[in-house]
Amino acid sequence: YKRCHKKGGHCFPKEKICTPPSSDFGKMDCRWKWKCCKKGSVN
């Protein structure tokens, strides 16, 4: 979040990013991350 502001970007609501498990027995690894855009971005 702060890192995004240092670059002069705009921060948006968090987005859930999921990565498949390394094994068939594992669950999906999901974590919330800030969705950031560069300064001057339309979204």
Swiss-Prot record:
<dbReference type="InterPro" id="IPR000881">
    <property type="entry name" value="Myotoxin"/>
</dbReference>
<keyword id="KW-0632">Potassium channel impairing toxin</keyword>
<keyword id="KW-0929">Antimicrobial</keyword>
<protein>
    <recommendedName>
        <fullName>Myotoxin-2</fullName>
    </recommendedName>
</protein>
<comment type="subunit">
    <text>Monomer.</text>
</comment>
<dbReference type="InterPro" id="IPR023355">
    <property type="entry name" value="Myo_ane_neurotoxin_sf"/>
</dbReference>
<comment type="similarity">
    <text>Belongs to the crotamine-myotoxin family.</text>
</comment>
<feature type="disulfide bond">
    <location>
        <begin position="4"/>
        <end position="36"/>
    </location>
</feature>
<dbReference type="GO" id="GO:0005576">
    <property type="term" value="C:extracellular region"/>
</dbReference>
<keyword id="KW-0872">Ion channel impairing toxin</keyword>
<keyword id="KW-1220">Voltage-gated potassium channel impairing toxin</keyword>
<feature type="disulfide bond">
    <location>
        <begin position="18"/>
        <end position="37"/>
    </location>
</feature>
<dbReference type="GO" id="GO:0044564">
    <property type="term" value="P:envenomation resulting in occlusion of the pore of voltage-gated potassium channel in another organism"/>
</dbReference>
<keyword id="KW-0964">Secreted</keyword>
<dbReference type="GO" id="GO:0090729">
    <property type="term" value="F:toxin activity"/>
</dbReference>
<keyword id="KW-1015">Disulfide bond</keyword>
<keyword id="KW-0528">Neurotoxin</keyword>
<keyword id="KW-0800">Toxin</keyword>
<keyword id="KW-0959">Myotoxin</keyword>
<comment type="function">
    <text>Cationic peptide that possesses multiple functions. It acts as a cell-penetrating peptide (CPP), and as a potent voltage-gated potassium channel (Kv) inhibitor. It exhibits antimicrobial activities, hind limb paralysis, and severe muscle necrosis by a non-enzymatic mechanism.</text>
</comment>
<dbReference type="Pfam" id="PF00819">
    <property type="entry name" value="Myotoxins"/>
</dbReference>
<feature type="disulfide bond">
    <location>
        <begin position="11"/>
        <end position="30"/>
    </location>
</feature>
<dbReference type="GO" id="GO:0015459">
    <property type="term" value="F:potassium channel regulator activity"/>
</dbReference>
